Amino acid sequence: MPKRVLQGVVVSDKTDKTVVVRVERRFTHPLLKKTVRRSKKYHAHDEANAWKVGDTVWIEEHRPISKLKNWIVIQGEKRAEV
């Protein structure tokens, strides 16, 4: 079975070797027929502490690393500096 891969934005990088990634999904409400946005936060392993707040990253399912971490960062894009 293939591992799930999700795209999200880093919202916290305060802990060592860990980033918190907010993944947003969109769906059509069954009754209102309106597009609804929902988000969920995932704790992901970042071995090199390379990703900072605002970066877009892709995370992949992994074996449990700790109580909260079941995902690892596989790639990403740095946020454009303004």
Curated annotation (Swiss-Prot):
- Molecular function via GO: rRNA binding; structural constituent of ribosome
Q: Which CDD domains match?
A: Ribosomal_uS17
BP GO terms, sorted: translation
What PANTHER family is this protein classified in?
40S RIBOSOMAL PROTEIN S11 FAMILY MEMBER, SMALL RIBOSOMAL SUBUNIT PROTEIN US17M
Family as reported in the entry's similarity comment: Belongs to the universal ribosomal protein uS17 family.
The free-text function statement in the UniProt record for this protein reads: One of the primary rRNA binding proteins, it binds specifically to the 5'-end of 16S ribosomal RNA.
HAMAP family tied to this protein: Ribosomal_uS17_B (MF_01345_B)
Q: What is this protein called?
A: Small ribosomal subunit protein uS17
Source organism per UniProt? Xanthobacter autotrophicus (strain ATCC BAA-1158 / Py2)
Taxonomic placement: Bacteria, Pseudomonadati, Pseudomonadota, Alphaproteobacteria, Hyphomicrobiales
